[in-house]
Amino acid sequence: IAYYIGTKSRQIQERDRTWLEKDNVDFHCNFLLGGQVKGEEPQLYLIYTPGNFIKATQETPFMQIGEAKYGKPILDRTITYNTPLEAMAKCALLSIDSTMKSNISVGPPINLVMYETDSYTIRHTLELRLGDPYLAKMRKLWEEYVQQAFEAMPNIEWKYKDDNTEENIFID
């Protein structure tokens, strides 16, 4: 399916390239595609604009599209292949919230679905809008805990020089 969507994306780009360029439209689209075929394991793919794709693995159990640089460190430090699904969902929300905190162009609504292996249906959906109490509570708690962790960090063990000799530590 990922190959099919990638091929269709490439065909649309080739077909409409003249008009897209004429109107100065930068046609870039990435897709997250996840699901399960009966009798197989669930799969998750990231399909890129040119049509190529990568698959989530045990080593890389999550994929991200859009503004990724602000929220990815939380995912990298928290998510493993064996992280429970509910914890992954909370981490995804923290990742998005961190991105919203650092980039004003990113904001609600946040739509999230959670798929359980072999259920063959989406039973869990979530939409968080601006001012949602859960989103506000999550942000407040996260900021408090990050501040507490920061304050608990050990002090830097500086090397102290007691003489006044000047030494150039910069390299030209």
Predicted features, each with a name:
Residues I1-D172:
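N-terminal nucleophile
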